[in-house]
């Protein structure tokens, strides 16, 4: 992994509503702590940090736009006043937002993706990022997945969901990295 230029750090949908039992079991309980490590390094270097905030239109969702607590960012990684937040109501951080034009205006060539959840916003945004021509890095231990039940009523563990989503993104859509690898590389530069 060789990170070119300073990539924009994308922090996707790390909101209190994802702590609701509605989502089921989750993997990577340390994801928010890893995001905080990356945020701290990006802030120290004054690099581009961009958040997305999901405002669901589904009334039963803990992320429904009327659920004021559910849509709030988790305190551990809450944006600072000068950091940009793009609000959205679909899985992709690029749809219905100015994310792409903002990145192009800032001449950002690469992005480092973190956030929740691996099978929703993270995967969808990583795919779109690559398709739009951005060099895309996905921090596998700074993202997390939730268990799902498939069409045959089989429950798939969050670990398996995460593993398969990461595998599907690997090489074709994103370079998969870990928090420690990113931080080590930055210290060497």
Task: Give the residues covered by each predicted segment.
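Acidic/histidine-rich helix-loop elements
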Residues: 19-28, 153-155
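A short alpha/beta connector and helix-capping loop motif
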Residues: 23-51
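Active-site-adjacent betaalpha module
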Residues: 1-8, 36-40, 44-45, 62-189
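Short, well-ordered beta-to-alpha junction loops that form the rim of enzyme active sites
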Residues: 53-55, 116
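A short acidic, helix-capping loop that chelates divalent metal ions and anchors anionic groups
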Residues: 18-22, 58-61, 147-149
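N-terminal nucleotide-binding beta1-loop-alpha1 segment
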Residues: 9-14
């Amino acid at each position: 992994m060789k990170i070119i230029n300073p990539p924009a750090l994308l922090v996707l949908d790390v909101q209190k509503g994802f702590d609701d039992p509605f989502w089921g079991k989750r993997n990577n309980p340390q994801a928010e702590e890893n995001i905080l490590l990356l945020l701290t390094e990006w802030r120290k270097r004054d690099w581009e940090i961009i958040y997305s905030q999901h405002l669901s239109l589904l009334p039963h969702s803990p992320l429904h736009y009327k659920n004021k607590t559910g849509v709030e960012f988790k305190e551990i990684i809450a944006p600072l006043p000068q950091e940009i937040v793009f609000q959205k109501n679909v899985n992709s951080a690029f749809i219905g937002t100015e994310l792409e034009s903002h990145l192009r205006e800032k001449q950002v060539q690469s992005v480092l993706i973190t956030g929740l959840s691996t099978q929703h916003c993270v995967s969808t945004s990583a795919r779109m990022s690559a398709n739009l021509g951005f060099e895309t890095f996905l921090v596998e231990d700074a993202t997390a997945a939730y268990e799902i039940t498939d069409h045959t009523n089989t429950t798939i563990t969050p670990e398996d969901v995460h593993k398969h989503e990461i595998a599907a993104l690997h090489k074709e859509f994103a370079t998969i990295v870990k928090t420690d690898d990113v931080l080590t590389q930055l210290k060497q530069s």
